[in-house]
């Protein structure tokens, strides 16, 4: 058996991977094992009771985390006229149309979120091969294709996260940083879980929230007792 590193050994001593922890205890343990020299992200994985092979059971959307993400977000907006001005006033970092498209085609992708007004999709649609693989393609399901670009910009800046089920029916999302307090992380997790509950597909049968686990970038992961979510 391979010898555990000091970090892994310390984590294994503190977190029992076979145990289900109440949500507050799980978050506390994950924070305590996030000992890297940078502010590690705190991530959650949620196993949903869906059939990911069926298109009518895929879960996708976005939610604004009440305590934010702890990350500075750069936002690019495809808009023109009054909508472009509204986007700038809301705090967008880059606003344009054909010029922004050329910038992206040239490989200058220095932003984290792309928002588009519906009337610009004729231009944005041609960028699918560039933006799609990076998870940046605007989509109405997550609120990034909208006539209200100003609100979309404010949401992105305020800590909005996008989520979608992977091929195994699991949602992966960041709910904050190791520097956050347990209550902040718990509030963000509750907001995400609430959004997932509201996005439950009508065709999904049986238990919907099957498994939850939280982890940090370099630290340990702890499984959460699902029932403890509603108890808080």
Swiss-Prot record:
Domain of life the protein comes from: Bacteria
CDD domains: Ribosomal_L1
Gene Ontology MF term list: rRNA binding; structural constituent of ribosome; tRNA binding
Keywords of this entry: Repressor, Ribonucleoprotein, Ribosomal protein, RNA-binding, rRNA-binding, Translation regulation, tRNA-binding
Claim: Hydrolase is one of the keywords in the record: no
Gene3D superfamilies documented for this protein: 3.30.190.20, 3.40.50.790
Biological processes, Gene Ontology terms: regulation of translation; translation
Cellular component terms (Gene Ontology): cytosolic large ribosomal subunit
Protein family according to the UniProt entry: Belongs to the universal ribosomal protein uL1 family.
Subunit structure: Part of the 50S ribosomal subunit.
Role: Binds directly to 23S rRNA. The L1 stalk is quite mobile in the ribosome, and is involved in E site tRNA release.
The protein, known as: Large ribosomal subunit protein uL1
Native source species: Bordetella petrii (strain ATCC BAA-461 / DSM 12804 / CCUG 43448)
Gene: rplA
